[in-house]
């Protein structure tokens, strides 16, 4: 039992009573007994029982002069029906108050409570009633009772907000049949308060396709306390074009309903708003009147609980019993119109061309058709006519894997055969197998596993239309019914599996889908590429806005599941009555899916044969084995190589691992086992990063959006080990979907990503007023390990020297390089990551992870991410070069040798310090004493001898001087000696010379014996020779 609220009279304010008031009138607010006595007094005054201020008698009241309403319910659940005079009416003799229906009474749908007799009556034609409910399905303007409150950083934003990027312009926007949420990063609440006399429920329909907006619905009481904190307030995502429904039970009393959205804008892409329509609230008391049908609708039966929409080319006014038809030749109208519109002259935007299926002659015709429904006129001035159809062209060949059997259609090749589309299907040669998949590059008819559709969230103009049309060498978006239609193209593939020879492989990639496209737009068109896994939920993988040149995009499939790939094209997101962007379109030239289950083959590839006999059927190779070309037998890949996921034929299918890496057991991936070796200046450095193999985390920020929303970048890094498994996990916690799926062990959850490096955006709880921090926008930064080296460049990934501070030691940094196999519009080669491991003995344990100061988000271009990981665990293992020995003193015949680390110590673990060494030795104390004594004695002796010889020398000098003086005095007294002349020619043969000099030995002897043997000194004087001697 519901009553329908429309326009400004539908809503109820905060704390209003439960009864639905009559239009333009307010119910009483006082308690029942006060109201009764007050009205009785008024009636007595009007009847003349009490003194009146005017002596003029009042006319008696007629039924048209007053209306009935109920008082508030008292504590016993009772109320009174009282008569209330209409405004600007003066009369006397109002009916007395009578006891009313119980407070929980209500009428059925299609009925109203006739207050005079207090009985339920059916609504008449042109009106409707919802009984004890209230419904909001008209959103031309915000209905009465609803309010918008925009908040930012827990601050209510009012009209006085003068910030240029404030939230004063953020609100829910009525769009006719639905209401649309904000698109910015403000928090906007759509609020409605209702007072229920009995338990009921609230029900609404919604579209919520973009997880960059947080959408929550919750209920509070009149004390602003949540009614049920255990209820999940997060609304689940819906598929594109799907209207989901949400309902919550309501308790009796005041219920304040909140539809709250918060946009998270971290990039330049615009978010898709939340849409809400058909809000129904059950549990209000009664309605005292039926409501007329809104314009564009009608009700032709008594007791209706809703109104029907007028069909196309008809219209109706308010309260209509039937719809009036427009003039067929000159007017038209859409469904639910309140008036007819004149038909405009036809233009080139009113028709489109298609290609007919091939006929038996292999020809296709170009046909021109008016856009349906046709609303233009050809008979007006300046109107164009439809171009002639029927021009024939040669049909394109069949798509690869299909053949033409002489009919006008193409058929898939039987299993085990292949065709390029121009020839008959042929069986694959011995030793080969079909390369299954789909390759659509000719578009004469829509393939059997594809379908197209059109929908609009605000109308049903294009329901049943083809969203896309084939056009020979491409397929293009169709005309649709409005410029804001979603034109949908779906491709369904039941699963993916590797070739037979690779069945045992454990590689992550199972297949890939590639499409070539271009967009031609004059407005804000958008092409969405979406993926649905196992028919659970459709997620937008990538989108392109505006005009885009012809390009290819590849999406990799990592698991075997049922996939539905969707291309959705929208010319503009603003709905308009006239067509302005009909010529905006998207063209897809080819779609290729590899390794598709139930696919067809355009070629054959080599496979491994059984060893029993030549030409036997294909057999799967064990993991890590390739097919040898000479024998077509399986052979294991060499060490330190991994098997290509695209082909296994030939030894070249085994791709060498990068530096510092090794293959896992299955040769499916290369990984680092956390050990690294490097030669430096004839010294071998050994690193062991095992203690850093667990996931390292970094919370970077904070950063702020244009409106000031604080958020953080959260990174998880799985450095090495674990046999190459991706241990870093990032999740979105907007709903509890992830937790439930993880507990259940399902592989279908999409809110969780695993990689070597991943990133999430964290919104702190205080930033948006949430009870807990929110994690969203989880992306994979690295899912493939490239290598580890001390060099700063590896496979086009370069770490600039000024990216991080210069190290303080001579220990080289070790660099781990990764990449992501998923390409994006901004990173056509995928993302890449470099992790610089730096030895820092002061950072114990897991150490510290940081990002470049120049790139606080970890990346400067959005494609390459850099991290510096400092830890003592990043130091090399200790060797004999990292310590030195210290010898102690010899004590008691023993000597100790100690070993200590070099300072500062730049190594960990490795070898340990040797034990102290104890060796025997000769004590040096005694010899030191002997040496000291001998030295002292020698010194004294030398001093004594010096003094002695000095004294003796003084005496000798004195005696010599005395002797010389004595000799000189005697020579003076003697007469002169005669001399004999020597004649010329004679020889002096008798000349004898006696020396007075002694040798050194003689001197020593004389000194030793002089005192004892000779008390006289003899001095030989030199004299001239005389003849008497």
UniProtKB/Swiss-Prot annotation:
SUPFAM superfamilies (alphabetical): Growth factor receptor domain (SSF57184), Mannose 6-phosphate receptor domain (SSF50911)
Swiss-Prot/TrEMBL keywords: Cell membrane, Disulfide bond, Glycoprotein, Membrane, Phosphoprotein, Signal, Transmembrane, Transmembrane helix
An annotated GO BP: positive regulation of BMP signaling pathway
Gene3D superfamilies attached to this UniProt entry: Mannose-6-phosphate receptor binding domain (2.70.130.10), Tumor Necrosis Factor Receptor, subunit A, domain 2 (2.10.50.10)
Phosphoserine: residues bearing it: 1018
Compartment(s): Cell membrane
GO MF term list: BMP receptor binding
Glycosylated position list: 169, 405, 691
GO cellular component: membrane; plasma membrane
Topology with respect to the bilayer: Single-pass type I membrane protein
Known function: Functions as a regulator of the BMP signaling pathway and may be involved in epidermal differentiation.
Family, as annotated: Belongs to the ELAPOR family.
PANTHER family (alphabetical): ENDOSOME_LYSOSOME-ASSOCIATED APOPTOSIS AND AUTOPHAGY REGULATOR FAMILY MEMBER 2, PROTEIN CBG13728
Protein name as catalogued: Endosome/lysosome-associated apoptosis and autophagy regulator family member 2
């Amino acid at each position: 039992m519901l009553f329908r609220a429309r326009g400004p009279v539908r809503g109820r304010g905060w704390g209003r009573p439960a009864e639905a008031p009559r239009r333009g009138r307010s119910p009483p607010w006082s308690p029942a007994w006060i109201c009764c006595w007050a009205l009785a007094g008024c009636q007595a005054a009007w009847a003349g029982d009490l003194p009146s201020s005017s002596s003029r008698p009042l006319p008696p009241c007629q039924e048209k002069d007053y209306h009935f309403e109920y008082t508030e319910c008292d504590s016993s659940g009772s109320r009174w029906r009282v008569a209330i005079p209409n405004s600007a009416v003066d009369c006397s003799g109002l009916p007395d108050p009578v006891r009313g229906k119980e407070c929980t009474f209500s009428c059925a749908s299609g009925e109203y409570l006739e207050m005079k007799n207090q009985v339920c009556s059916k609504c008449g034609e042109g009106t409707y009633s919802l009984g004890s409910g209230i419904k909001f399905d008209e959103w031309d303007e915000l209905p009465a009772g609803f309010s918008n409150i925009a908040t930012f950083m827990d601050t209510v934003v009012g009209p006085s907000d003068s910030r240029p990027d404030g939230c004063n312009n953020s609100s829910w926007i009525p769009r006719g049949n639905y209401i649309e949420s904000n698109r910015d990063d403000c928090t906007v609440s759509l609020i409605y308060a209702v007072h229920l006399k009995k338990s009921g429920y609230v029900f609404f329909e919604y579209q919520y396709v973009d997880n960059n907006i947080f959408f929550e619905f919750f209920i509070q009481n009149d004390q602003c306390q949540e009614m049920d904190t255990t209820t999940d307030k997060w609304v689940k995502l819906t598929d594109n074009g799907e209207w989901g429904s949400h309902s919550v039970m309501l308790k009796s009393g005041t219920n304040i309903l909140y539809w709250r959205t918060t946009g998270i804008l971290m990039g330049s892409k615009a978010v898709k708003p939340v849409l809400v329509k058909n809000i129904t609230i059950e549990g209000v008391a009664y309605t005292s009147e039926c409501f007329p049908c809104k314009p564009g609708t009608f009700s032709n039966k008594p007791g209706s609980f809703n109104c029907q929409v007028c069909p196309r080319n008809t219209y109706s006014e308010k309260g209509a019993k039937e719809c009036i038809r427009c003039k067929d030749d000159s007017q038209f109208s859409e469904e639910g119109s309140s008036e007819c519109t004149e038909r405009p002259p036809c233009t080139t935007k009113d028709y489109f061309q298609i290609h007919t299926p091939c006929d038996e002659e292999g020809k296709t015709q170009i046909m021109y058709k008016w856009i349906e429904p046709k609303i233009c006129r050809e008979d007006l001035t300046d109107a164009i006519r439809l171009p002639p159809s029927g021009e024939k062209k040669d049909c394109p060949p069949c798509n690869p894997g299909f053949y033409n059997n002489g009919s006008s259609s193409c058929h898939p090749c039987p299993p085990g055969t292949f065709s390029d589309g121009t020839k008959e299907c042929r069986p694959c040669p011995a030793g080969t197998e079909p390369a299954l998949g789909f390759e659509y590059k000719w578009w004469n008819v829509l393939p059997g596993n594809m379908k197209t559709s059109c929908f609009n969230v605000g109308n049903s103009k294009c329901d049943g239309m083809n969203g896309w049309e084939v056009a020979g060498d491409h397929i293009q978006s169709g005309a649709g019914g409005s410029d804001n239609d979603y034109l949908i193209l779906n491709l369904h593939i039941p699963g993916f599996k590797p070739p037979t020879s690779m069945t045992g492989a454990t590689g992550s990639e199972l297949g890939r889908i590639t499409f070539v496209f271009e967009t031609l737009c004059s407005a804000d068109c958008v092409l969405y590429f979406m993926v649905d896994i196992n028919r659970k939920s459709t997620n937008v993988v990538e989108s392109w806005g505006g005009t885009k040149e012809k390009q290819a995009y590849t999406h990799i499939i990592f698991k075997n599941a049922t996939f539905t790939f969707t291309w959705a094209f929208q010319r503009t997101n603003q709905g308009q009555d006239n067509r302005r962007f009909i010529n905006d379109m998207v063209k897809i030239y080819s779609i290729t899916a590899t390794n598709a289950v139930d696919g067809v083959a355009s070629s054959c590839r080599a496979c491994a044969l059984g060893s029993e006999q030549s030409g036997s059927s294909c057999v799967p190779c064990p993991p890590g084995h390739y097919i040898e070309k000479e024998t077509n037998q399986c052979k294991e890949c060499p060490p330190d190589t991994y098997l290509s996921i695209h082909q296994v034929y030939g030894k070249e299918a085994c791709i060498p691992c990068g530096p510092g890496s090794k293959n896992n057991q299955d040769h499916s991936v290369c990984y680092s086992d956390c050990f690294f070796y490097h030669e430096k200046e004839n010294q071998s450095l050994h690193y062991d990063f095992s203690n850093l193999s667990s996931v390292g985390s970094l919370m970077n920020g904070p950063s702020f959006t244009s409106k000031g929303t604080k958020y953080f970048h959260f990174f998880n890094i799985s450095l090495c080990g674990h046999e190459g498994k991706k241990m870093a996990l990032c999740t979105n916690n907007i709903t509890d979907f992830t937790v439930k799926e993880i507990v259940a062990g399902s592989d279908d959850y999409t809110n969780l990503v695993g990689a070597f490096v991943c990133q999430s955006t964290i919104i702190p709880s205080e930033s948006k007023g949430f009870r807990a921090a929110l994690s969203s926008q989880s992306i994979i930064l690295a899912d493939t390990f490239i290598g580890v080296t001390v060099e700063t460049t590896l496979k086009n990934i370069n770490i600039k020297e000024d990216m991080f501070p210069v190290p303080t030691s001579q220990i080289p940094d070790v660099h781990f390089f990764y990449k992501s196999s998923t390409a994006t519009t901004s990173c056509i080669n995928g993302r890449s990551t470099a992790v610089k491991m730096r030895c820092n003995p002061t950072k114990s344990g897991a150490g510290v992870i940081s990002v470049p100061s120049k790139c606080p988000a970890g990346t400067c271009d959005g494609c390459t991410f850099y991290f510096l990981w400092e830890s003592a665990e990043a130091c090399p293992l200790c060797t004999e070069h990292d310590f030195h020995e210290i010898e102690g003193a010899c004590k008691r015949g023993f000597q100790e040798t100690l070993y200590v680390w070099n300072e500062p110590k730049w190594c960990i673990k490795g070898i340990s310090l040797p034990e102290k060494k104890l060796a025997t030795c000769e004590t040096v104390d005694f010899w030191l004493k002997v040496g000291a004594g001998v030295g002292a004695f020698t010194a004294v002796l030398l001093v004594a001898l010096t003094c002695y010889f000095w004294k003796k020398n003084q005496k000798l000098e004195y005696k010599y001087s005395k002797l010389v003086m004595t000799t000189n005095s005697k020579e003076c007294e003697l007469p002169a000696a005669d001399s004999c002349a020597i004649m010329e020619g004679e020889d002096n043969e008798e000349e004898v010379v006696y020396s007075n000099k002694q040798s050194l030995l003689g001197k020593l002897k004389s000194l030793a014996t002089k005192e004892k043997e000779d008390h006289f000194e003899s001095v030989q004087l030199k004299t001239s020779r005389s003849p008497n001697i």
